[in-house]
From Swiss-Prot:
Subunit structure: Monomer.
Main location: cytoplasm
Provenance organism: Staphylococcus aureus (strain bovine RF122 / ET3-1)
Keywords annotated in UniProt: Aminoacyl-tRNA synthetase, ATP-binding, Cytoplasm, Ligase, Metal-binding, Nucleotide-binding, Protein biosynthesis, Zinc
Catalysis performed (reactions): tRNA(Cys) + L-cysteine + ATP = L-cysteinyl-tRNA(Cys) + AMP + diphosphate
rRNA-binding keyword on record: no
This protein's GO CC annotations: cytosol
Motif residue range(s): 'HIGH' region: 30-40
Name the record gives this protein: Cysteine--tRNA ligase
Cofactor: Zn(2+)
Pfam families xref list: CysS_C, DALR_2, tRNA-synt_1e
Lineage summary: Bacteria, Bacillati, Bacillota, Bacilli, Bacillales
Localization, UniProt: Cytoplasm
CDD domains, sorted: CysRS_core (cd00672)
Annotated binding of Zn(2+), by residue: C28, C208, H233, E237
Amino acid sequence: MITLYNTLTRQKEVFKPIEPGKVKMYVCGPTVYNYIHIGNARPAINYDVVRRYFEYQGYNVEYVSNFTDVDDKLIKRSQELNQTVPEIAEKYIAAFHEDVGALNVRKATSNPRVMDHMDDIIQFIKDLVDQGYAYESGGDVYFRTRKFEGYGKLSHQSIDDLKVGARIDAGEHKEDALDFTLWKKAKPGEISWDSPFGEGRPGWHIECSVMAFHELGPTIDIHAGGSDLQFPHHENEIAQSEAHNHAPFSNYWMHNGFINIDNEKMSKSLGNFILVHDIIKEVDPDVLRFFMISVHYRSPINYNLELVESARSGLERIRNSYQLIEERAQIATNIENQQTYIDQIDAILNRFETVMNDDFNTANAITAWYDLAKLANKYVLENTTSTEVIDKFKAVYQIFSDVLGVPLKSKNADELLDEDVEKLIEERNEARKNKDFARADEIRDMLKSQNIILEDTPQGVRFKRG
């Protein structure tokens, strides 16, 4: 039974899908005017884990994440580079796929783009105008915020409180300062589309409402994104969608915490703006992913090199222990009376599932993985290895790897580490001392299969790589 924290109700709730066995999930994607920064990477990784865990539990997940490919930032960038908006968007959509692919984020079921849904957006806005929820003024179209009775329910703000501080900017023709833009009148030299309201382009909020409706229907199971999107973006999505569809927009809302850089907010003005495109040249992408999930998704996370190094060390411990298990698989035998280890492995797996069922607590899930690695090391050092136990270890390691999306081997780690070879040599020496020559030969042959040659010298056994 999976429970998740629902921002809408401010409490953990048991997940109940609209359709049994299926999850319809929409995650707000990036505005593709630049390479993504690590703040964009966090939701991509966190909600990839959510998706993976639902799939592990047998659900069919329809995972939709959009690209905003027309926006003020894109228009400004196209003017700076003297390129078209579509050219800019194509470049950074390709870069996004490359960056999140390096972070082992699975491809979405669908990545809708705003430009591909322009007719749908225009029709959606027209429907809202026809229903009295929106109005055209001076070539712009605005949403009548006060007409939607539930406005503020996601961010838990009253509309009267929101009124304080709201203002109408010069050039706007709103009925109310709280009304927000659905359609922007075209400006000279900007990309635009023809519509019943005149030449222009959509506002940011309407885009996600329309793409979610087109891809997943009037009501979805889970809508997710960063905490910064809760208000006004997601609040406005609810207003537009529920006014248009006459149905709840999303049953569950998930929001991940912010990323700070050395305990400071990430910003270009502070010079601490970190692009994934750059950082994965210096930090192993697997380590970066492991670091991101080492903290619960709703909590803020602090990025610094010391913490990243700690994540690297932790992942290395897990991988080293798995490597020992793989090595022992080659010399394991059918030994009975090791049920205690099977039971301990099952207990760790049960704990992993328990913490993941509790709002996808990856921090505690990683603790369970560390405990599995500790048990594996103890087992290998203290026991003659059983095929049954080794296979059980491998199966649970693979589950943890698949759910958390962290590979069990680094991309360039096909070779045994020197320290692991030394441990095997010590074990072989002990086997020879005990006249267990069969085991000694098995270890020698296993090392040979890894192109590691043992040499007897007056100083003891040494090895070299073939």
